[in-house]
A protein has these predicted regions:
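Repeated scaffold domains used in trafficking and secretory/extracellular systems
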Residues: 78-88, 127-146
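Acidic, small-residue rich beta-repeat scaffolds with periodic aromatic anchors
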Residues: 1-19, 23-26, 136-272
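Short beta-strand elements that form the blades of beta-propeller/WD-repeat-like
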Residues: 14-50, 92-105, 111, 141-164
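Terminal domain-start segments
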Residues: 1-81
């Protein structure tokens, strides 16, 4: 039947589709195979035919063209393929392959292969994190990319305890994901943080514009909601007011106005 035009893809926009490029181990790779395919290296001491292969590198090949992501550790299993593959096509017509492998501690490595100009090159490896959104208890996992101009990836920060945050990314000139926004939404973090003493903060309006300084008393609940992951953390108080904590030292121990964050707050959660 007919399809409503509003649901048809924009021919001038880029897109991302799931793909299923064949995979084989280096032991069985047919050197005469001219099709596009992946070849994985394994640590023979870690091979487990029931649970999969512990891979140590991944190569994308086509004929005599190839590129390898070295020292990429992931499990490949025929029944449960932990390697997700996406073909990324930008609005300029450039094409890339994103090979996404679950790594350690809920991290994902996105291996970016450039397949333009009848060649294969490794642009790099982008590391992101699974996202758990506490506003939706049923949501946990990876964002699935569908739009080169709107890809959302999780990152881990440590400016206010440990937290997971995510933000919009776009495909860069070399195919690598690049941050498009300067602020990330915090999806999981120290939800029970309370001030141990009076704290000077910057008040914000509902558009996150700074409105002036104010002192918040001890015992106030601070819910972290946004951050730039470098200089501030925005929080919501129980009465709905929005405040900004300005970070003056980013390495541990993190400081706000020259005081250690652990001396200012209780209930901060740390992971890793």
């Amino acid at each position: 039947g007919d399809v409503n035009e509003e649901y048809l893809p924009d021919e001038n926009a880029g897109y991302i589709v799931n793909c299923d490029i064949p995979m084989t181990g280096s032991t069985w790779d047919d050197k005469s195979d001219t099709s596009l395919h992946f070849v994985y290296e394994t640590d023979e001491s870690e091979e487990d035919y029931d649970n999969g292969y512990e891979c140590t590198a991944l190569t994308l090949k086509k004929g005599d063209k190839s590129a390898t992501a070295e020292e990429e550790y992931f499990t490949y299993n025929y029944d449960k393929n932990f390697l997700k593959q996406y073909k990324v096509v930008t609005k300029e017509g450039k094409e890339y392959i994103y090979a996404c492998a679950l790594s350690y501690n809920d991290y994902t490595d996105v291996m970016v292969f450039d397949i333009n100009d009848d060649d294969i090159k490794l642009s790099g490896v982008f590391t992101c994190h699974l996202v758990y959104d506490t506003s939706d208890p049923d949501y946990y996992g990876e964002f699935i990319p569908t739009d080169p101009e709107n890809m959302y990836f999780g990152q881990v920060g440590n400016l206010f305890g440990t937290y997971t945050c995510y933000g919009r990314h776009v495909v860069g000139d070399d195919g690598m994901p690049e941050p498009a926004d300067s602020v990330y939404k915090i999806s999981w973090g120290s939800e029970e943080a309370k001030s141990l003493k009076s704290i000077n903060v910057t008040m914000l309006d509902d558009k996150y514009n700074e409105q002036g300084e104010e002192t918040i008393d001890a015992g106030e609940h601070f819910l972290p909601i946004r951050t730039d992951n470098s200089s501030f953390v925005d929080c919501r108080l129980d009465d709905g007011r929005l405040v900004r904590l300005k970070i003056t030292k980013t390495d541990y121990p993190v400081q706000i106005d020259g005081e250690d964050v652990d001396d200012l707050f209780e209930g901060l959660v740390y992971a890793g």
